[in-house]
Amino acid sequence: MLVYVLGTSNKVHTDATLANLSHIAPHWTVLCDCDYDTAALNDHLHAYDRSFFMTLHAGDLLSSSFVSELTEQLAALPEHCAGIIYERGAATTLHHFPSPPLIWRTSAVRSSGRPFFLEKDELPFAAYRLHDNLFHLKRDWSWQTIQHTGWQPRAKHYPKWHKAQEEWDLIRPLLEAGAAALLPEVKPTPAISIALCTFNNADYLLWAIRSVLAQSMSNWELIIIDDASSDNTQMKLASLPADPRIRMYTNDSNYGKSHCLNVALSMAEAPWLLELDADDWLPQDAIRILLSTADTATRETSLLYGDYYEWTEGARKQLIFGGIRKTPANVQADALLAGALPIAPRCYRVEALHSIHGWMLNAPYGGRLYEDFEIIIRLSHSHQLRHLPVPLYHRRIRKSSITHQHSEKYAGWMKWMREQAVLPQGDGGDARPST
Protein backbone atom coordinates (compact mmCIF):
# COMPACT_ATOMS: atom_id res chain seq x y z
CA MET A 1 0.00 0.00 0.00
CA LEU A 2 1.23 3.46 -0.93
CA VAL A 3 0.48 6.08 1.74
CA TYR A 4 0.69 9.83 1.21
CA VAL A 5 1.12 11.84 4.41
CA LEU A 6 -0.11 15.38 3.81
CA GLY A 7 0.32 18.61 5.74
CA THR A 8 3.79 17.80 7.05
CA SER A 9 4.87 21.28 8.14
CA ASN A 10 4.64 20.26 11.81
CA LYS A 11 7.50 17.86 12.56
CA VAL A 12 5.98 16.49 15.77
CA HIS A 13 2.74 15.54 14.02
CA THR A 14 4.60 14.10 11.03
CA ASP A 15 6.93 12.01 13.17
CA ALA A 16 3.98 10.61 15.14
CA THR A 17 2.24 9.41 11.97
CA LEU A 18 5.43 7.98 10.46
CA ALA A 19 6.23 6.09 13.68
CA ASN A 20 2.68 4.75 13.83
CA LEU A 21 2.80 3.49 10.22
CA SER A 22 6.23 1.96 10.72
CA HIS A 23 4.86 0.00 13.66
CA ILE A 24 1.56 -1.29 12.23
CA ALA A 25 2.53 -1.65 8.54
CA PRO A 26 6.31 -1.66 8.03
CA HIS A 27 5.85 -3.02 4.50
CA TRP A 28 3.85 0.01 3.30
CA THR A 29 5.50 2.71 1.19
CA VAL A 30 5.11 6.14 2.78
CA LEU A 31 5.60 9.50 1.03
CA CYS A 32 5.41 12.93 2.65
CA ASP A 33 4.34 16.06 0.80
CA CYS A 34 7.38 18.07 1.85
CA ASP A 35 7.30 21.45 0.02
CA TYR A 36 4.29 20.05 -1.89
CA ASP A 37 6.29 18.97 -4.94
CA THR A 38 3.32 18.10 -7.15
CA ALA A 39 5.40 16.78 -10.04
CA ALA A 40 7.23 14.28 -7.82
CA LEU A 41 4.06 13.18 -6.04
CA ASN A 42 2.14 12.68 -9.27
CA ASP A 43 5.07 10.91 -10.97
CA HIS A 44 5.24 8.42 -8.12
CA LEU A 45 1.51 7.77 -8.35
CA HIS A 46 1.74 7.39 -12.13
CA ALA A 47 4.27 4.57 -11.70
CA TYR A 48 2.31 2.92 -8.89
CA ASP A 49 0.93 -0.51 -9.88
CA ARG A 50 -1.28 -1.44 -6.92
CA SER A 51 -5.08 -1.19 -6.89
CA PHE A 52 -5.42 1.21 -3.94
CA PHE A 53 -3.53 3.93 -2.12
CA MET A 54 -4.14 5.87 1.08
CA THR A 55 -4.01 9.50 2.18
CA LEU A 56 -3.43 10.59 5.76
CA HIS A 57 -2.69 13.92 7.38
CA ALA A 58 0.27 14.44 9.66
CA GLY A 59 -0.88 13.59 13.17
CA ASP A 60 -3.38 10.91 12.06
CA LEU A 61 -2.97 7.52 13.75
CA LEU A 62 -4.19 4.02 12.83
CA SER A 63 -4.98 1.18 15.25
CA SER A 64 -3.06 -2.10 15.23
CA SER A 65 -6.11 -3.91 13.81
CA PHE A 66 -6.58 -1.44 10.96
CA VAL A 67 -4.43 -3.31 8.42
CA SER A 68 -6.23 -6.66 8.70
CA GLU A 69 -9.64 -4.98 8.67
CA LEU A 70 -8.67 -2.93 5.63
CA THR A 71 -7.72 -6.08 3.72
CA GLU A 72 -11.21 -7.48 4.28
CA GLN A 73 -12.90 -4.19 3.38
CA LEU A 74 -11.00 -3.87 0.10
CA ALA A 75 -11.80 -7.45 -0.88
CA ALA A 76 -15.51 -6.68 -0.48
CA LEU A 77 -15.45 -3.22 -2.07
CA PRO A 78 -17.74 -3.03 -5.15
CA GLU A 79 -16.06 -2.23 -8.46
CA HIS A 80 -18.07 0.97 -8.89
CA CYS A 81 -16.68 2.45 -5.66
CA ALA A 82 -13.78 4.88 -5.98
CA GLY A 83 -12.67 4.23 -2.42
CA ILE A 84 -13.54 4.30 1.25
CA ILE A 85 -14.44 7.22 3.49
CA TYR A 86 -14.00 6.51 7.18
CA GLU A 87 -16.26 8.30 9.64
CA ARG A 88 -15.90 8.42 13.40
CA GLY A 89 -19.37 9.87 14.01
CA ALA A 90 -20.84 13.33 14.35
CA ALA A 91 -19.13 13.94 17.69
CA THR A 92 -15.73 14.27 16.03
CA THR A 93 -16.84 16.08 12.90
CA LEU A 94 -15.15 19.48 12.88
CA HIS A 95 -16.71 22.56 11.31
CA HIS A 96 -19.19 20.45 9.33
CA PHE A 97 -16.52 19.44 6.82
CA PRO A 98 -17.16 16.07 5.16
CA SER A 99 -14.39 13.59 5.80
CA PRO A 100 -12.29 13.16 2.67
CA PRO A 101 -11.53 9.60 1.53
CA LEU A 102 -8.68 7.75 3.16
CA ILE A 103 -8.60 4.93 0.60
CA TRP A 104 -8.52 5.68 -3.14
CA ARG A 105 -8.92 3.25 -6.04
CA THR A 106 -5.97 3.91 -8.33
CA SER A 107 -7.90 3.25 -11.54
CA ALA A 108 -10.65 5.68 -10.49
CA VAL A 109 -8.14 8.46 -9.87
CA ARG A 110 -6.49 7.83 -13.23
CA SER A 111 -9.84 7.87 -15.00
CA SER A 112 -10.46 11.45 -13.87
CA GLY A 113 -8.25 12.82 -16.62
CA ARG A 114 -6.33 15.16 -14.36
CA PRO A 115 -3.45 14.96 -11.86
CA PHE A 116 -4.36 13.85 -8.35
CA PHE A 117 -2.20 16.55 -6.78
CA LEU A 118 -3.12 19.93 -8.26
CA GLU A 119 -0.74 22.86 -8.40
CA LYS A 120 -1.40 25.64 -5.90
CA ASP A 121 -2.49 28.00 -8.67
CA GLU A 122 -5.29 25.58 -9.59
CA LEU A 123 -6.51 25.31 -5.99
CA PRO A 124 -5.07 27.90 -3.58
CA PHE A 125 -6.67 26.20 -0.56
CA ALA A 126 -4.45 23.22 0.26
CA ALA A 127 -6.79 22.02 3.02
CA TYR A 128 -9.44 21.13 0.43
CA ARG A 129 -7.43 19.30 -2.20
CA LEU A 130 -8.75 15.88 -1.15
CA HIS A 131 -12.31 17.20 -1.04
CA ASP A 132 -11.80 18.54 -4.55
CA ASN A 133 -10.81 15.09 -5.79
CA LEU A 134 -13.78 13.58 -3.96
CA PHE A 135 -16.24 15.91 -5.70
CA HIS A 136 -14.54 15.43 -9.06
CA LEU A 137 -14.83 11.64 -8.92
CA LYS A 138 -18.45 11.71 -7.72
CA ARG A 139 -19.61 12.29 -11.29
CA ASP A 140 -18.77 8.74 -12.33
CA TRP A 141 -18.05 6.83 -9.13
CA SER A 142 -19.70 6.12 -5.80
CA TRP A 143 -18.04 6.00 -2.39
CA GLN A 144 -18.33 3.58 0.48
CA THR A 145 -18.61 5.16 3.93
CA ILE A 146 -17.63 3.08 6.95
CA GLN A 147 -18.01 3.95 10.62
CA HIS A 148 -14.62 3.06 12.03
CA THR A 149 -12.73 3.81 15.23
CA GLY A 150 -9.44 2.44 13.94
CA TRP A 151 -8.59 5.78 12.39
CA GLN A 152 -7.78 8.57 14.83
CA PRO A 153 -7.58 11.91 12.99
CA ARG A 154 -5.46 14.63 14.51
CA ALA A 155 -7.55 17.14 16.42
CA LYS A 156 -7.57 20.42 14.53
CA HIS A 157 -7.21 23.67 16.41
CA TYR A 158 -7.83 26.80 14.38
CA PRO A 159 -6.43 30.18 15.47
CA LYS A 160 -9.05 32.81 16.20
CA TRP A 161 -8.29 34.71 12.99
CA HIS A 162 -8.96 31.61 10.87
CA LYS A 163 -12.65 31.67 10.01
CA ALA A 164 -12.67 28.01 9.04
CA GLN A 165 -16.41 27.50 8.72
CA GLU A 166 -16.95 30.66 6.68
CA GLU A 167 -14.03 29.74 4.45
CA TRP A 168 -15.39 26.26 3.77
CA ASP A 169 -18.90 27.54 3.12
CA LEU A 170 -17.53 29.93 0.47
CA ILE A 171 -15.14 27.54 -1.28
CA ARG A 172 -17.21 24.34 -1.26
CA PRO A 173 -19.79 25.53 -3.86
CA LEU A 174 -17.00 26.27 -6.34
CA LEU A 175 -15.42 22.85 -5.81
CA GLU A 176 -18.73 21.04 -6.22
CA ALA A 177 -19.86 23.10 -9.20
CA GLY A 178 -16.53 22.80 -10.96
CA ALA A 179 -16.65 19.03 -10.64
CA ALA A 180 -20.09 18.89 -12.24
CA ALA A 181 -19.57 21.48 -14.98
CA LEU A 182 -20.02 20.27 -18.56
CA LEU A 183 -18.47 22.20 -21.44
CA PRO A 184 -20.83 23.19 -24.27
CA GLU A 185 -20.08 22.05 -27.81
CA VAL A 186 -21.49 25.26 -29.30
CA LYS A 187 -21.07 28.74 -27.89
CA PRO A 188 -24.38 30.05 -26.50
CA THR A 189 -25.42 33.62 -27.18
CA PRO A 190 -23.71 35.41 -24.29
CA ALA A 191 -25.77 37.53 -21.92
CA ILE A 192 -22.60 38.84 -20.29
CA SER A 193 -18.98 39.23 -21.36
CA ILE A 194 -16.29 38.75 -18.73
CA ALA A 195 -13.04 40.64 -19.27
CA LEU A 196 -10.00 39.09 -17.62
CA CYS A 197 -6.86 41.14 -18.25
CA THR A 198 -3.59 39.66 -17.03
CA PHE A 199 0.08 40.52 -16.87
CA ASN A 200 2.44 38.06 -15.18
CA ASN A 201 -0.34 36.56 -13.06
CA ALA A 202 0.24 32.93 -13.99
CA ASP A 203 0.14 31.91 -10.31
CA TYR A 204 -3.44 33.17 -9.96
CA LEU A 205 -5.01 32.88 -13.38
CA LEU A 206 -6.40 29.34 -13.33
CA TRP A 207 -8.35 29.79 -10.10
CA ALA A 208 -10.01 32.93 -11.49
CA ILE A 209 -10.95 31.06 -14.67
CA ARG A 210 -12.20 28.07 -12.69
CA SER A 211 -14.61 30.36 -10.84
CA VAL A 212 -16.07 31.41 -14.20
CA LEU A 213 -16.44 27.82 -15.39
CA ALA A 214 -18.23 27.00 -12.11
CA GLN A 215 -20.95 29.63 -12.56
CA SER A 216 -24.55 28.52 -12.07
CA MET A 217 -25.46 30.16 -15.40
CA SER A 218 -23.62 29.18 -18.56
CA ASN A 219 -24.58 31.91 -21.05
CA TRP A 220 -21.39 33.93 -20.63
CA GLU A 221 -18.28 34.54 -22.67
CA LEU A 222 -14.80 34.97 -21.19
CA ILE A 223 -12.37 37.30 -22.94
CA ILE A 224 -8.79 36.84 -21.71
CA ILE A 225 -6.30 39.56 -22.65
CA ASP A 226 -2.65 38.71 -21.96
CA ASP A 227 -0.69 41.97 -21.80
CA ALA A 228 2.56 40.40 -23.11
CA SER A 229 3.31 38.44 -19.94
CA SER A 230 6.88 37.22 -19.47
CA ASP A 231 6.03 34.41 -17.03
CA ASN A 232 4.38 31.09 -17.93
CA THR A 233 0.94 32.61 -18.51
CA GLN A 234 0.75 31.21 -22.03
CA MET A 235 1.52 27.70 -20.80
CA LYS A 236 -1.26 27.97 -18.22
CA LEU A 237 -3.74 29.23 -20.81
CA ALA A 238 -2.78 26.42 -23.18
CA SER A 239 -3.76 23.91 -20.47
CA LEU A 240 -7.38 25.08 -20.43
CA PRO A 241 -10.03 22.71 -21.81
CA ALA A 242 -11.47 23.65 -25.19
CA ASP A 243 -14.49 25.85 -24.51
CA PRO A 244 -16.21 27.88 -27.25
CA ARG A 245 -17.14 30.53 -24.66
CA ILE A 246 -13.49 31.42 -24.02
CA ARG A 247 -11.52 33.68 -26.34
CA MET A 248 -7.92 34.75 -25.83
CA TYR A 249 -5.87 37.59 -27.23
CA THR A 250 -2.20 38.37 -26.56
CA ASN A 251 -0.78 41.87 -26.97
CA ASP A 252 2.47 42.21 -28.90
CA SER A 253 3.79 44.52 -26.17
CA ASN A 254 2.86 45.56 -22.64
CA TYR A 255 0.33 48.39 -22.94
CA GLY A 256 -1.33 48.50 -19.52
CA LYS A 257 -4.73 47.71 -18.04
CA SER A 258 -6.79 50.42 -19.79
CA HIS A 259 -5.59 49.34 -23.22
CA CYS A 260 -6.44 45.71 -22.41
CA LEU A 261 -9.91 46.65 -21.24
CA ASN A 262 -10.50 48.60 -24.44
CA VAL A 263 -9.49 45.52 -26.43
CA ALA A 264 -11.92 43.40 -24.41
CA LEU A 265 -14.64 46.02 -24.92
CA SER A 266 -14.13 45.88 -28.68
CA MET A 267 -14.46 42.08 -28.61
CA ALA A 268 -17.49 41.89 -26.30
CA GLU A 269 -20.61 40.36 -27.85
CA ALA A 270 -22.90 40.75 -24.83
CA PRO A 271 -24.74 43.85 -23.56
CA TRP A 272 -22.92 43.75 -20.22
CA LEU A 273 -19.18 43.57 -19.46
CA LEU A 274 -17.98 42.22 -16.11
CA GLU A 275 -14.41 42.98 -15.11
CA LEU A 276 -12.55 40.17 -13.30
CA ASP A 277 -9.01 40.75 -12.07
CA ALA A 278 -6.69 37.80 -12.66
CA ASP A 279 -5.96 37.36 -8.95
CA ASP A 280 -9.61 37.50 -7.85
CA TRP A 281 -12.52 35.12 -8.38
CA LEU A 282 -16.31 34.97 -8.53
CA PRO A 283 -18.85 33.30 -6.23
CA GLN A 284 -20.83 30.59 -8.00
CA ASP A 285 -24.03 32.68 -8.34
CA ALA A 286 -22.41 36.01 -9.21
CA ILE A 287 -23.41 36.05 -12.87
CA ARG A 288 -26.94 34.82 -12.18
CA ILE A 289 -27.56 37.60 -9.67
CA LEU A 290 -25.98 40.29 -11.86
CA LEU A 291 -28.03 39.27 -14.90
CA SER A 292 -31.23 39.11 -12.85
CA THR A 293 -30.60 42.70 -11.77
CA ALA A 294 -29.61 43.73 -15.29
CA ASP A 295 -33.01 42.58 -16.55
CA THR A 296 -34.72 45.21 -14.39
CA ALA A 297 -32.14 47.98 -14.78
CA THR A 298 -33.12 51.19 -16.57
CA ARG A 299 -31.38 52.19 -19.80
CA GLU A 300 -29.63 54.94 -17.83
CA THR A 301 -27.94 52.37 -15.57
CA SER A 302 -24.32 52.03 -16.68
CA LEU A 303 -22.79 50.11 -13.78
CA LEU A 304 -23.89 47.30 -11.48
CA TYR A 305 -21.73 46.82 -8.40
CA GLY A 306 -22.05 45.00 -5.11
CA ASP A 307 -20.28 44.07 -1.91
CA TYR A 308 -17.34 41.69 -1.86
CA TYR A 309 -15.48 39.09 0.19
CA GLU A 310 -11.97 40.14 1.17
CA TRP A 311 -8.99 37.77 1.38
CA THR A 312 -5.49 38.74 2.46
CA GLU A 313 -2.59 36.86 0.92
CA GLY A 314 0.12 35.79 3.38
CA ALA A 315 3.84 35.45 2.84
CA ARG A 316 3.43 31.88 1.54
CA LYS A 317 0.42 32.87 -0.58
CA GLN A 318 -2.01 31.36 1.92
CA LEU A 319 -5.35 33.15 1.91
CA ILE A 320 -6.88 34.56 5.09
CA PHE A 321 -10.58 35.37 4.96
CA GLY A 322 -11.28 38.84 6.30
CA GLY A 323 -15.05 38.99 5.98
CA ILE A 324 -17.51 40.91 3.82
CA ARG A 325 -16.70 44.45 2.74
CA LYS A 326 -19.75 46.59 2.05
CA THR A 327 -19.72 49.39 -0.51
CA PRO A 328 -21.91 52.51 -0.38
CA ALA A 329 -25.37 52.31 -1.89
CA ASN A 330 -24.66 55.65 -3.58
CA VAL A 331 -21.21 56.34 -5.01
CA GLN A 332 -20.28 60.01 -5.30
CA ALA A 333 -17.27 61.04 -7.38
CA ASP A 334 -15.69 63.19 -4.65
CA ALA A 335 -16.07 60.50 -2.01
CA LEU A 336 -14.74 57.85 -4.37
CA LEU A 337 -11.65 59.95 -5.09
CA ALA A 338 -11.02 60.98 -1.50
CA GLY A 339 -11.39 57.52 -0.04
CA ALA A 340 -9.90 55.50 -2.91
CA LEU A 341 -12.80 53.18 -2.25
CA PRO A 342 -12.55 49.80 -4.02
CA ILE A 343 -15.66 48.95 -6.04
CA ALA A 344 -16.18 45.27 -6.82
CA PRO A 345 -17.58 43.71 -8.82
CA ARG A 346 -17.80 46.17 -11.70
CA CYS A 347 -20.34 45.16 -14.31
CA TYR A 348 -20.74 47.75 -17.08
CA ARG A 349 -23.39 48.31 -19.71
CA VAL A 350 -21.43 47.98 -22.95
CA GLU A 351 -23.48 50.68 -24.68
CA ALA A 352 -22.57 53.16 -21.93
CA LEU A 353 -18.87 52.32 -22.21
CA HIS A 354 -18.97 52.93 -25.95
CA SER A 355 -20.72 56.26 -25.39
CA ILE A 356 -17.66 57.57 -23.51
CA HIS A 357 -15.20 55.70 -25.78
CA GLY A 358 -14.02 53.27 -23.15
CA TRP A 359 -11.02 53.68 -20.89
CA MET A 360 -8.53 56.56 -21.08
CA LEU A 361 -4.94 56.02 -22.17
CA ASN A 362 -3.78 59.65 -21.90
CA ALA A 363 -4.37 59.91 -18.16
CA PRO A 364 -1.36 60.02 -15.83
CA TYR A 365 0.57 56.75 -15.95
CA GLY A 366 -0.91 55.89 -19.33
CA GLY A 367 -3.97 54.12 -18.01
CA ARG A 368 -1.88 51.61 -16.07
CA LEU A 369 -3.17 52.75 -12.67
CA TYR A 370 -6.56 53.69 -11.19
CA GLU A 371 -8.44 52.88 -14.38
CA ASP A 372 -11.34 51.59 -12.27
CA PHE A 373 -11.82 54.94 -10.55
CA GLU A 374 -11.60 57.01 -13.73
CA ILE A 375 -14.16 54.96 -15.65
CA ILE A 376 -16.65 54.96 -12.75
CA ILE A 377 -16.28 58.71 -12.20
CA ARG A 378 -16.77 59.45 -15.89
CA LEU A 379 -19.82 57.20 -16.08
CA SER A 380 -21.33 58.71 -12.93
CA HIS A 381 -21.55 62.15 -14.55
CA SER A 382 -23.97 61.00 -17.23
CA HIS A 383 -25.36 57.64 -16.11
CA GLN A 384 -26.83 55.89 -13.09
CA LEU A 385 -24.93 53.43 -10.92
CA ARG A 386 -26.83 50.62 -9.19
CA HIS A 387 -25.72 48.88 -6.01
CA LEU A 388 -26.59 45.29 -5.14
CA PRO A 389 -26.42 44.77 -1.34
CA VAL A 390 -24.95 41.27 -1.60
CA PRO A 391 -21.33 40.03 -1.90
CA LEU A 392 -20.69 39.07 -5.53
CA TYR A 393 -16.90 39.01 -5.73
CA HIS A 394 -13.84 37.58 -3.99
CA ARG A 395 -11.11 40.23 -3.77
CA ARG A 396 -7.54 39.23 -2.96
CA ILE A 397 -5.31 41.76 -1.17
CA ARG A 398 -1.63 41.20 -1.91
CA LYS A 399 1.42 43.38 -1.42
CA SER A 400 2.85 42.48 -4.83
CA SER A 401 -0.09 43.91 -6.78
CA ILE A 402 0.51 46.87 -9.07
CA THR A 403 -1.80 49.09 -7.03
CA HIS A 404 0.03 48.37 -3.76
CA GLN A 405 3.43 48.87 -5.38
CA HIS A 406 2.46 52.34 -6.63
CA SER A 407 0.21 53.59 -3.82
CA GLU A 408 2.28 56.79 -3.45
CA LYS A 409 1.21 57.90 -6.94
CA TYR A 410 -2.48 58.12 -6.10
CA ALA A 411 -2.38 61.67 -4.70
CA GLY A 412 -1.00 63.06 -7.96
CA TRP A 413 -3.50 61.14 -10.05
CA MET A 414 -6.39 62.28 -7.82
CA LYS A 415 -5.30 65.91 -8.16
CA TRP A 416 -5.22 65.57 -11.96
CA MET A 417 -8.66 63.96 -12.04
CA ARG A 418 -10.19 66.70 -9.93
CA GLU A 419 -8.76 69.38 -12.20
CA GLN A 420 -10.62 68.06 -15.24
CA ALA A 421 -13.32 70.69 -15.73
CA VAL A 422 -14.62 68.78 -18.72
CA LEU A 423 -14.19 65.06 -18.36
CA PRO A 424 -12.23 63.69 -21.32
CA GLN A 425 -13.32 60.84 -23.54
CA GLY A 426 -11.71 57.45 -23.55
CA ASP A 427 -9.34 56.12 -26.15
CA GLY A 428 -10.77 52.86 -27.37
CA GLY A 429 -13.49 50.29 -27.50
CA ASP A 430 -14.35 50.69 -31.18
CA ALA A 431 -11.53 49.02 -33.11
CA ARG A 432 -11.32 45.26 -32.77
CA PRO A 433 -7.84 43.74 -32.42
CA SER A 434 -6.27 41.82 -35.24
CA THR A 435 -5.95 38.12 -34.50
Residue ranges of each PLM-predicted region?
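A conserved acidic beta->alpha catalytic loop
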Residues: S9-H13, C34-Y36, D226-M235, S253, ...
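Short, acidic, metal-binding catalytic loop of nucleotide-sugar glycosyltransferases
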Residues: A16-W28, R210-N219
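Acidic donor-binding loop at a coil-to-helix junction in glycosyltransferase catalytic cores
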Residues: L118-L130, Y365-I375
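Glycine-rich, basic loop-to-helix element that forms the pyrophosphate-binding segment
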Residues: C34-Y48, N251-A268
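Short aromatic/hydrophobic "clamp" motif used to bind/position activated sugar donors
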Residues: F53, L273
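A recurrent flexible, glycine/aromatic-enriched loop bordering the glycosyltransferase active site
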Residues: Y86-I103, A329-C347
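Conserved donor NDP-sugar-binding/catalytic core segment of glycosyltransferases
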Residues: L61-L94, I287-L319
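N-proximal low-complexity "stem/linker" segments adjacent to membrane-targeting elements
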Residues: M1-A19, K156-S211
